[in-house]
């Protein structure tokens, strides 16, 4: 990843970034992907990707690429602060990240031509350009996203751990398609809620592992004929097999057990959806999950700022960022710091992005979703 600043860390150029697995993941054919993995050999260390997915299109001008010297119609309402990297400034609501800026890079060179949410998301997550524009943003992908491809390429963990996890939930516009239902992301639910536990990890009262195995065997006998003729059933069999592995795996149960974290650690990440999702993501990659997609669209179930789609008619970009950005800051700063402290920084790539950015020119509206004057930016 390259930026214009002179930093003490090694510069990672765009080709390397793409080769590592974001946009290029969908562009690489599956045989090529499997061949590269075979070449790497069994001695290579397992690697993971954590995607902090800010669906809606976060504004670069209110986050990591501020223009404080631009005219008022462009620069925006927020102010920059200095970081520990000379010449590099980020938003004032990122004080924690400003102290670890030498541990991440700002990428300004990636772009595409899609201007609607689902089209842009599909381009970023699958590497495939939709054939025609869909201004309604209702399109779903014809190809799997990079997490689904990774799940297929790496195969099932022997200990039942899924390869692809959606922390809170996964992108709604991508589908596993020809790879099969077993490679859809395993969605965890909101880890910040008191009742959080990975979905379906707790067996029904009175049902132990032996009885579960018996029920599974009986179901297999009933389905033996149907599976011979029904291709869809084969995909569901894979999904059911994965679900049973998850149910009975102590490794999975341990990875999802947030009670093992200290109260201080939970506070440091932030007692909110995004902070606890970052903490869960760290635990999951430590347990061997290949791809974790953190749903960072809405800060909470009750937030009026339910996505990053900061049109003037929707939100007030200043007020919305005051809610969002401190939560982004505590979650990402703690995650990046922990990965470095635990020696995982060479094995885990953390990406924070949305499907596109926002226009340089600020727009205004007499009333937004909150019946207040709106200030925002459009798709770009």
Name what the model sees in each region.
Residues 1-380:
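Ligand-binding pockets and gating/stacking loops
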